[in-house]
Amino acid sequence: RQMCIRDSFYTAEELAEIEVPHPSKTVMKHMGTPSVSEAAALLSANNSRLLVPKKKGENYTVAAALDIRTVRQGHIEIVGAGPGDPDLVSVRGRQMLERADLILDAGSLVPKELTLCAKAGATVLSSASMDLEEQFEVMKKFYDKGKFIVRLHTGDPCIYGAIQEQMNYFDQHGMSYHITPGISSFQAAAAALKSQFTIPEKVQSIILTRGEGRTPMPEREKLHLMARSQSTMCIFLSASIAEQVQEELLQEYPETTPVAVCYHLTWKDEQIFRGELKDLARIVKENNLTLTTMIVVGEAIGNREGLSRLYAHEFKHLYRK
């Protein structure tokens, strides 16, 4: 097998600037630099790491250094799986899954079909039975071996995705990571309801929030305060406290405000229940809805009134004058 070896030449001045573990006064006297072999090896390896210190032969001195730029580094990709349908993961997200040496997913919250694209030999694990430290332990083990890791979260990982503590750990340990966003369940709800969640001149804001359950809410973000704007409200993780949610929202929204309770959005067993705000708790209770349920409130649900000015004949913009 032929090897391609690149020759590099350095001046004594360049070599003298490199700190080496075994400087020589004799070499300094004759060559004008305290080291030739070790200094040259380190210079060629971008001053990374000395792998083999200088060895003396009868007519030569040799040393070897490792350029860490050529060593495979570990990496963690936090990927948003989307709301459920495997086809809704992004192109980049699927590419990351196909590349991964380890896929750590969120168990039953992520469809198994999504990990079928894993390459041969990849490890696929569920984090459902792991606490945070156990998750860190398995990811660090693969990372330290230079492996590519996908941490697969439901929806978009940056929305109620519990990635804050993970990023904190990665930052503290100097670990490389990146986030691939995913489609959130509130976007899937808009599509399933065939509704634009903003209405020209009526509703121009979308509130993403949750009811106050085991996780306390900041006082300024109580549901009844958020409801004062009567914006389109998408309420995560709150089906189990639907009665409390209804009570708070009725302080500001009319009782006839449209609501939609969306279960398992984009999954094969998806169910959508529509009604009015005064019926919210009853809808949830009668259909035994708890987990993976999104509650949407607002007059934008099913609305067909109000026209955007964007495509009006007299509306001028950069591409139409």
PLM region spans:
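Short glycine-rich anion-binding loops that position phosphate/pyrophosphate groups of nucleotides
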Residues: 55-59, 67-68, 83-86, 109, ...
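Short, solvent-exposed amphipathic alpha-helical segments in soluble enzyme
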Residues: 66-69, 91-96, 118-121, 166-169, ...
